[in-house]
């Protein structure tokens, strides 16, 4: 499997245990040579990788580079990242979706979890708020060649009104406003998220 932009490694901690004995796990973070946020993320992630033998077999590639050989991967996963890839409309997201399609075997799966925006939210507002419309991702995937295989409401949250001063980062776990209305945002909980499964024909 490939995990796109693993951040600080929350899902890596789970996935590495499943893949250690009989699997191949490729993590594809931002290249730290980009500096700034990418470098800080890599510092945190590389510290995790060095903390336990369970991470010793993880292979590293980078977003926008060649993640793996074409048609060599069974599944690609991304969790709450697509809003970061639409700062220029959809150019970066298209590149990553195409790279994902290319590395997957026929019949392979692309799993997506993302903060869910209200219908008809503009791309500009999606980028600012961190919420992305379900249709935007489905259309992007279909344009790349994927078929929507399944979807789940396991990560849905009907309390999430999606109209906060600091976007999705107002809610936990970020709590960007710190103590301001903290109990209110803790009561809402984490964001309403779509969970989509695409397949390469």
Regions found by a protein language model. Name each.
Residues 130-151:
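Short alpha-helix
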Residues 181-201:
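C-terminal lobe and adjacent flexible extensions of AdoMet/dcAdoMet transferase-like proteins
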Residues 66-77:
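A short acidic, Gly/Pro-enriched loop at the edge of an enzyme's catalytic core
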Residues 1-7, 34-39, 89, 108-136:
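Conserved class I S-adenosyl-L-methionine
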Residues 21-23, 104-110:
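Short glycine-dipeptide loop
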Residues 8-67:
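Class I SAM-dependent methyltransferase SAM/SAH-binding core
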Residues 17, 92-106:
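A short glycine-rich, Lys/Arg-flanked "PGG" loop and its adjoining helix->strand segment in the class I
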């Amino acid at each position: 499997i490939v995990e796109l932009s693993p951040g600080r490694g929350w899902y890596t901690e789970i996935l590495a245990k499943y893949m250690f004995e009989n699997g191949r796990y490729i993590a594809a973070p931002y290249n730290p040579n980009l500096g700034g946020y990418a470098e800080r993320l890599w510092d945190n992630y590389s510290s995790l990788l060095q903390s336990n033998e369970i991470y010793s077999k993880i292979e590293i590639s980078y977003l926008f580079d060649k993640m793996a050989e074409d048609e060599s991967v069974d599944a690609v996963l991304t969790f709450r990242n697509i809003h970061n890839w639409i700062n220029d409309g959809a150019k970066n997201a298209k590149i990553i979706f195409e790279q994902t399609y290319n590395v997957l075997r026929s019949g392979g799966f692309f799993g997506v979890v993302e903060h869910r925006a209200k219908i008809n939210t503009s791309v500009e507002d999606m980028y600012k708020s961190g919420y992305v419309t379900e249709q935007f991702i489905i259309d992007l995937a279909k344009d790349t060649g994927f078929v929507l295989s399944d979807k789940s409401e396991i990560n849905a949250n009907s309390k999430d009104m999606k109209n906060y001063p600091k976007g999705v980062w107002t809610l936990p776990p970020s709590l960007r406003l710190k103590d301001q209305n903290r109990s209110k945002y803790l009561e809402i909980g984490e964001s309403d998220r779509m969970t989509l499964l695409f397949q390469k024909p």
